[in-house]
Amino acid sequence: MTTRKTASSLQLLGKITGTKAGTKQKKMNFINGLIWLYMCVWMVHGKVTQKDELKWNKGYSLPNLLEVTDQQKELSQWTLGDKVKLEEGRFVLTPGKNTKGSLWLKPEYSIKDAMTIEWTFRSFGFRGSTKGGLAFWLKQGNEGDSTELFGGSSKKFNGLMILLRLDDKLGESVTAYLNDGTKDLDIESSPYFASCLFQYQDSMVPSTLRLTYNPLDNHLLKLQMDNRVCFQTRKVKFMGSSPFRIGTSAINDASKESFEILKMKLYDGVIEDSLIPNVNPMGQPRVVTKVINSQTGEESFREKMPFSDKEESITSNELFEKMNKLEGKIMANDIDPLLRKMNKIVENERELIQRLRPLLDLKKTAISDDSFQDFLSMNANLDRLIKEQEKIRQDAKLYGKQTKGHDEIFSKISVWLALLIFIMITLAYYMFRINQDIKKVKLL
């Protein structure tokens, strides 16, 4: 941020001095601006750690463009397309009006563990509405070799495109598109999977785009603009066996916008700057839209997130309202058939009851008569049993009395017999003693 403020102040100072000085002073300002540009590039890429140096793949990176003397030899790894020019240490992709250009790395790159690509770019000389833009490519396969899509590819390409362009409603923005090569990509209607706002037009200070892809970290894909996170996702998975074609392209339509590439570095891994936490996310404006209820005509204002023309976002209250409406419709759709079925069942039950009622009445009458007759016969049987039981009880009483009289007579006879036996035994004893006494007397 400090470098941008300093650059803007120097630019303002250059304009003031230019109005006072004249043509010679303008030339001096141009030279000073060029020196300042080189200083900014050095400041942007001056902080590189030793670990990052070990990961730096110089064979797949641009050389120091300020030191290039033999383009055919030192830039043999790169393909320059259309109107690209190497001027004063930078590639100018669009050197004039209605021009386009591209810069492609000739050898294809295969990811071993992870990769990080850093592009240093600048848009200079124009600010305003334009249909042009700057695209950065990460393609797989041979699809899309034409230049109909921002000077770099056909509409049928397989891979990733990161596009910087001016949106008519929201201004300067960065959008990311994916395509599998089976269908045409239309910038106006095709959906993008990520986006952020980024001011890049007519800037004295170059900007840095850093793209990191790490398959080992659950396919982390992360884009940083000037060390601020534009987006990161783990839902994008590239084909591991297919190598990548890396490049950039631009088109400026009818404007004088000059898209410039100052540096490109490729690292075989994740560098330390890629791990900067997202503590200062890129700001996004709020868009207020007037919504008119088609049923009631009521007007309301709703905030939408950026880039919500294709995919509208809704607030929590609106989400709850829609859920309540959906729940009501579901309940209504569920209850109405149930009510109809219940009413039909009730009608069937009523009809069945009406048909069974005469049969039930006849059965009830027959059951009542039979039950009454059975009750009377049972009562008569009970009376007969009671009488028989009473008669048996009386007979038992009489038999009991008779048995008791006999027992008394037998007991009296037994007493007299016992007494008689005792008397007889006593008499026999005395007679025996008398006989013994008589025998003793005779002996004497």
Curated annotation (Swiss-Prot):
Domain L-type lectin-like per the UniProt entry, residue ranges: 52-269
Motif (Di-lysine motif): 440-444
Subunit structure: Interacts with EMP47 in the endoplasmic reticulum membrane in order to be transported to the Golgi apparatus. Interacts with the coatomer proteins COP1, SEC21 and SEC23.
Domain comment (free text): The di-lysine motif confers endoplasmic reticulum localization for type I membrane proteins.
Pfam families per UniProt: Lectin_leg-like
Topological region Lumenal: 47-408
Gene that encodes it: EMP46
Major subcellular location class: Golgi
Transmembrane segments: 409-429
Region called Mediates the interactions with COPI and COPII coat complexes, residue ranges: 429-432
Its biological purpose: Involved in the secretion of glycoproteins and in nucleus architecture and gene silencing.
Domain of life: Eukaryota
One Gene Ontology MF term: carbohydrate binding
Family, similarity comment: Belongs to the EMP46/EMP47 family.
Record topological domains on the Cytoplasmic side: 430-444
Keyword Protein transport: yes
The name this protein goes by in its record: Protein EMP46
Outcome of mutating Y429A: Impairs interaction with COP1, SEC21 and SEC23 and loss of endoplasmic reticulum exit
Membrane topology field: Single-pass type I membrane protein
Keyword 4Fe-4S: no
Record-listed K(+) binding positions: Y177
